[in-house]
């Protein structure tokens, strides 16, 4: 009779334990609350005096509960330190010197579809009273599955947030880029833009100025995603404001650098090339701020030169250490090719880069003065070189033909 009463009382306690943990799960309690309830449920309703509970984490198992244990136990169990036999449920754990589970009587591995998700170490309160190992293991399994479901739901939410962020960043970027480029008797323009991912870090623009001037630029911002898109959006707004104020190139570059450094405190930077062409004086002025040097191709002479004069990249220093404004006079009938490093760093299956020399050779030998024809033929060359090898970065090529 006494034995029957004991069994009844034990089953009643187990039922209470089960109800407490399932009720907390149904109420969508936080991970910490669920773990705390599990801990006190084991200590109050089950024949357990001390326990340690490890849950799977990337690279190993993290200690989430430790109660009633005086010896030093590791906060993390590395996966490579655990040898498991799912069939027998036995584990062999290699501990570093100074750590021990000697105080604990037994351990219960918790599996889900042959994957070890948790380990429960415990000691009974009374050696004369039984501990239902199967029930304790089942209770731990319920907790672990609930926590895994929470993790899965959280990852889904994070993925949705990231997906939405990428979509917004992509929309922001599209708004930054010009919707059309000139195709007139005095200026023809063509751009090829191939982002490495949905949101690239390249930016280009062509802006009509006052007094027969036109401004053109290309930039590459460090980083990707929403942060890079917003940074470039602010950069473009500052650039256009300065151009509308009719500021000279020196003032524009210094102000852009100050604004960028003030915003990012040196954590982000932008490589940038800005050019200004005056149709009335046939003068080209430019600044290269750490960007790939554009190619200036003189159509009549069939000569190529790099436009390198300028300064360091923007945003790295509070004050630019030096600044040189490049200038070319009496320019007429010429083409400018502005590009980002995604072009020269494009690789073939042998991991060889396309490089600046191949691009310069193509420009020098080009028989395609029209930018559209030039881009069509050049993209055939680079595709033939890469043989469908994936791009390493965003690829942007902006070609401007001046007559």
Please place each PLM-identified region on the residue numbering.
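Helix-loop-beta substructure at the N-terminus of cytosolic sensory domains
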Residues: 19, 24-65, 182, 266-268
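… and, occasionally, acidic/histidine-rich disordered N-termini of signaling adaptors
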Residues: 157-337, 389-403
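Active-site-proximal, acidic helix/loop segment immediately C-terminal to a metal-coordinating Asp/Glu
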Residues: 227-245, 330-389
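Short beta-strand-to-loop transition segments that serve as allosteric relay/switch motifs
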Residues: 103, 118-128, 147, 221, ...
């Amino acid at each position: 009779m006494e034995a029957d009463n004991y069994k009844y009382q034990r089953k009643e306690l187990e039922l209470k334990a089960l109800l407490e943990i399932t009720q907390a799960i149904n109420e969508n309690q936080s991970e910490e609350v669920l773990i705390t309830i599990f801990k006190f449920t084991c200590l109050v309703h089950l024949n357990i005096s001390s326990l340690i509970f490890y849950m799977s984490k990337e690279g190993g198992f993290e200690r989430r509960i430790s109660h009633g244990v005086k010896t030093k136990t590791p906060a993390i169990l590395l996966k490579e330190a655990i040898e498991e036999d799912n069939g027998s449920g036995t584990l062999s754990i290699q501990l570093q010197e100074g750590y021990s589970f000697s105080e604990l009587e037994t351990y219960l591995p918790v599996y889900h579809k042959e994957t070890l998700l948790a380990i429960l170490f415990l000691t009974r309160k009374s050696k004369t009273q039984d501990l239902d190992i199967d029930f304790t293991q089942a209770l731990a399994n319920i907790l672990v599955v609930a926590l895994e479901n929470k993790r899965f739901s959280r990852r889904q939410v994070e993925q949705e947030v990231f997906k939405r962020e990428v979509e917004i960043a992509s929309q922001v970027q599209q708004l930054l880029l010009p919707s059309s480029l000139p195709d007139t008797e005095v200026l023809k323009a063509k751009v090829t833009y191939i982002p490495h991912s949905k949101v690239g870090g390249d930016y280009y623009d062509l802006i009509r100025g006052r007094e027969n001037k036109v401004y053109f630029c290309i930039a590459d911002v460090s980083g990707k995603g929403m942060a890079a898109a917003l940074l470039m959006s602010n950069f473009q707004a500052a650039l256009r404001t300065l151009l509308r104020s009719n500021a000279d190139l020196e003032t524009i570059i210094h102000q852009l650098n100050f604004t960028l450094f003030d915003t990012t405190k040196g954590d982000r930077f932008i490589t940038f090339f800005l050019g200004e062409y005056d149709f009335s004086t046939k003068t080209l002025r430019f600044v290269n701020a750490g960007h790939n040097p554009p190619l200036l191709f003189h159509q009549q002479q069939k000569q190529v030169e790099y436009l390198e004069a300028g300064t360091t990249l923007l945003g790295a220093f509070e004050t630019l250490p030096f600044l040189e404004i490049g200038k070319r006079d009496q320019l007429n009938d010429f083409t400018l090719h502005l590009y980002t490093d995604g072009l020269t760093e494009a690789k073939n299956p042998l991991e060889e880069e396309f490089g600046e020399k191949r691009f310069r050779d193509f420009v020098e030998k080009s028989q395609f003065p029209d930018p559209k024809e030039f881009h069509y033929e050049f993209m055939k060359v680079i595709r033939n070189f890469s043989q469908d090898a994936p791009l390493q970065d965003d690829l942007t090529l902006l070609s401007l033909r001046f007559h």
